[in-house]
């Protein structure tokens, strides 16, 4: 079951969904709106038992604590069934599997979630879409890769930190490549000169 607009843009409300997910070797019903008051990294990947996908999925799991410390939940989604997810989770990493993950994998067998987030390609699989959703359910960041190359977990974490910073410091903006501890700037023609003078 899914509800949401057909055309998604940053700044819009993320489409809600309810679907079966696999977490901790169990099937569970997951509803996006139940994660209110948290940031969400929602990423789509093409298919289970493939090649680039496990490198991304396990990389997000290995960095899960860093996301959790930022009040952020991570969700992976593909058009595979929950049974396929479970089988992949029960395959060790050395054999191309996932092993134990720190976050849920969502089954989008009917392809409704992928369609709502505009990541479904003509072959019926999801492109590598990634969305950062804030605690109010607003999409703050989105990116879509083609199938052949993976995403950077470190860059996702950096963007999340920048989003959280500007939301808690509404009079400041983050320049290119900003990381926590770096200088920010005031979006004002006069005050911004302080940043550029020190750059």
UniProtKB/Swiss-Prot annotation:
Major subcellular location class: plastid
Q: What does this protein do?
A: Thiol-specific peroxidase that catalyzes the reduction of hydrogen peroxide and organic hydroperoxides to water and alcohols, respectively. Plays a role in cell protection against oxidative stress by detoxifying peroxides.
Q: Where is the Thioredoxin domain?
A: 8-165
SUPFAM superfamilies assigned: Thioredoxin-like
Compartments, as annotated in UniProt: Plastid, Chloroplast
GO MF annotation terms: thioredoxin peroxidase activity
Q: Does the keyword Oxidoreductase apply?
A: yes
Q: Which family does it belong to?
A: Belongs to the peroxiredoxin family. AhpC/Prx1 subfamily.
Please state what class of enzyme this protein is.
Answer: oxidoreductase
Q: Which GO terms describe its cellular component?
A: chloroplast
What name does the UniProt record give this protein?
Answer: Putative peroxiredoxin ycf42
How is this chain modified after translation?
The Cys-53-SH group is the primary site of oxidation by H(2)O(2), and the oxidized Cys-53 (probably Cys-SOH) rapidly reacts with Cys-174-SH of the other subunit to form an intermolecular disulfide. This disulfide is subsequently reduced by thioredoxin.
Q: Which Pfam families match?
A: 1-cysPrx_C, AhpC-TSA
The entry describes its oligomerization and partners as: Homodimer; disulfide-linked, upon oxidation.
Provide the catalytic activity annotation.
a hydroperoxide + [thioredoxin]-dithiol = an alcohol + [thioredoxin]-disulfide + H2O
Q: Can you name the source organism?
A: Pyropia yezoensis
Q: Which residues form the active site?
A: 53
A single GO BP = response to oxidative stress
Coiled-coil-forming residues are none
């Amino acid at each position: 079951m899914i509800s949401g607009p057909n055309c998604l843009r940053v700044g819009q409300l993320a489409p809600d969904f309810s679907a079966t997910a696999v977490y901790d070797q169990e099937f569970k019903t997951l509803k996006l709106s139940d994660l209110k008051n948290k940031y969400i990294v929602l990423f789509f990947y093409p298919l289970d038992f493939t090649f680039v996908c496990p490198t991304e999925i396990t990389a997000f799991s290995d960095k899960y604590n860093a996301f959790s410390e930022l009040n952020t939940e991570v969700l992976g989604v593909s058009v595979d069934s929950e049974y396929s997810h479970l089988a992949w989770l029960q395959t060790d990493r050395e054999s191309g599997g996932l092993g134990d993950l720190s976050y849920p994998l969502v089954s989008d067998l009917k392809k409704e979630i992928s369609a709502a987030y505009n990541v479904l390609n003509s072959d019926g699989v999801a492109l590598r879409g990634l969305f950062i959703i804030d605690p109010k359910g607003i999409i703050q960041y989105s990116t879509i890769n083609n199938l052949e190359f993976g995403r950077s977990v470190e860059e996702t974490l950096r963007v999340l930190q920048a989003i959280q910073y500007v939301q808690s410091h509404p009079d400041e903006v983050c320049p290119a490549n900003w990381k926590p501890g770096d200088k920010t700037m005031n979006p004002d023609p006069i005050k911004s000169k302080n940043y550029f003078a020190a750059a």
